[in-house]
Amino acid sequence: MSISIQQISYIHPDKEVLFSDLNFAISKGQKLGLVGNNGCGKSTLLQIIAGQLSPSSGVIVRPDDLYYIPQHFGQYDSLTIAQALQIERKQQALHAILSGDASNENFVILDDDWNIEERSIAALDLWGLGQFTLSYPMNLLSGGEKTRVFLAGMDIHHPSVVLMDE
């Protein structure tokens, strides 16, 4: 699936225009690098494409399985590895089902991903993080380890599109 950016603008809360009327498309299999001076809006644009920030105007068409690796990880310090990787709900649903709570909601959340924990642990191991559990706090990891946690997320989620901020 491709990404389409149509007439995207972003205005800071203080009314400063960061960028306006951006238009471009990225086709399946295409690789793109954003290059520009510090503060020109590269990270903001990636956050908008990822759906983590709303544009001031414009339309974005993106795949549902897009995966975003941020530049800075401080906002994840209060989370566990499982929470940062956005697998905690599936993990909880799996444990609930295995404990006898066969509610439809748990099956919907799990979405037949019965090996989510094994895949996640294997991905962490692949990225040199096999010593950490999924419940390990992100704030106890080094910057490089946090980066590798998010890189492991690519192996867990198998996204069609990956956005990497530096």
Q: What do these predicted ranges mean?
A:
Residues 1-5, 9-21, 130:
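A short, flexible loop at the N-terminus of ABC-type nucleotide-binding domains that lies
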Residues 35-37:
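The feature captures the beta-strand-to-loop junction immediately N-terminal to the Walker
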Residues 162-166:
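Catalytic Walker B motif of ABC-type/P-loop ATPase nucleotide-binding domains
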Residues 151:
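Hydrophobic anchor residue at the start of the ABC signature
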Residues 26-28:
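Conserved hydrophobic segment flanking the Walker A/P-loop of ABC-type ATPase nucleotide-binding domains
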Residues 75-140:
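ABC-family P-loop ATPase nucleotide-binding domains
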Residues 50:
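Helix-to-loop junction immediately C-terminal to a conserved catalytic motif
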